[in-house]
Amino acid sequence: MKYIGAHVSAAGGLANAAIRAAEIDATAFALFTKNQRQWRAAPLTTQTIDEFKAACEKYHYTSAQILPHDSYLINLGHPVTEALEKSRDAFIDEMQRCEQLGLSLLNFHPGSHLMQISEEDCLARIAESINIALDKTHGVTAVIENTAGQGSNLGFKFEHLAAIIDGVEDKSRVGVCIDTCHAFAAGYDLRTSAECEKTFADFARIVGFKYLRGMHLNDAKSTFGSRVDRHHSLGEGNIGHDAFRWIMQDDRFDGIPLILETINPDIWAEEIAWLKAQQTEKAVA
C-alpha cells in the first residue's frame, strides 16, 4: 500500500499537522516538530504529546506514515568542532522529540564540508554523528535525504549515502529518503520510465531498497544535472508526470511515506488524488 501525503504545517500545535493532512485526504504526512530555523525549542509538554498522538489515532496515521524533518540549521558533517557539537546536540534533541511523540523516523539533510575538509572526512563525521544520536535514543530511525549537491552539500551521490550507512553501527536504525527533484538536479535522470528503471537499478545496487524509508515527490524547476534545488508542482517541471506514475505503479515504494514538497499547497489535495489514481490505473491494466 502506498502512503501518500505532503509536508504540512504544524502551526498552532503539532496535532494540527495530522488534521491538515486529513483535510487533503493524505495517507501520510511530514512535519517539523519545532521551528526549523531555530536551534532550540521549549521541551514538549505532556499535553502537546497527548494531543498529537490523539489526532494521529483519530485520523488513522501510524508512525510508519509520518516522516518528521529536522532543523535546516543542523550540519552533522561540520568541519569545526564547536559547530559540529552544536549540530549533534540539536540532532539528538530532534530524535528525542520524535521518540516522545511516538514517531519512528527522522528525515535530515546529511551535511556540508564547507570547503574545509574532504568529502571522505565529512561523510565519516556524519556517520559518527548518527552513531552518537542512535546511542542516546531508542526506536527512531535516522533517515538520510539525498541532496541536489548545492554548494558543499554532500548526499548528492548514491555513493555518499552508502558511505554514511557503512559507517553507522546499527544498520537497523538508518535509512534514506530519496527526493526526486534533488536526484534529478544531481544528475539522476527520471524523465522516462526507462530512465527511472536505470536510476533505481543504480540505487538498488549502490544503496539497496531495504534502506529506503521515505520519498519526497517533487518535480523540478531546476534543470537536469544543474545541482540546483528548486521544486515544482507535479508534471509542471523538468521531470514530468511519467516518473511519478512509474513510482506509484512499483511495489518497491509501498509502505513508506511518499511526501509532496511541491510549491503550491493549494493543489496538494489534487496532486495526492492524481497519485492515488495512478495506482488504480495499474490495477485496471
UniProtKB/Swiss-Prot annotation:
Manner of cofactor binding, per the entry note: Binds 3 Zn(2+) ions.
UniProt KW Ion transport keyword: no
Positions contributing to Zn(2+) 2 binding: E145, D179, H216, E261
Keyword Zinc: yes
Positions that bind Zn(2+) 3: H182, D229, H231
Reaction catalysis annotation: Endonucleolytic cleavage to 5'-phosphooligonucleotide end-products
SUPFAM superfamilies: Xylose isomerase-like
The protein's Enzyme Commission number: 3.1.21.2
InterPro entries per UniProt: AP_endonuc_2 (IPR001719), AP_endonuc_F2_Zn_BS (IPR018246), Xyl_isomerase-like_sf (IPR036237), Xyl_isomerase-like_TIM-brl (IPR013022)
Cofactor(s), by name: Zn(2+)
GO biological process: base-excision repair
Segments crossing the lipid bilayer: none
Residues at which Zn(2+) 1 binds: H69, H109, E145
Molecular function terms from GO: deoxyribonuclease IV (phage-T4-induced) activity; DNA binding; DNA-(apurinic or apyrimidinic site) endonuclease activity; phosphoric diester hydrolase activity; zinc ion binding
Record-stated family: Belongs to the AP endonuclease 2 family.
The protein's role, per its UniProt record: Endonuclease IV plays a role in DNA repair. It cleaves phosphodiester bonds at apurinic or apyrimidinic (AP) sites, generating a 3'-hydroxyl group and a 5'-terminal sugar phosphate.
NCBIfam families named in the record: nfo, PRK01060.1-4
Protein name: Probable endonuclease 4
Species: Escherichia coli (strain SMS-3-5 / SECEC)
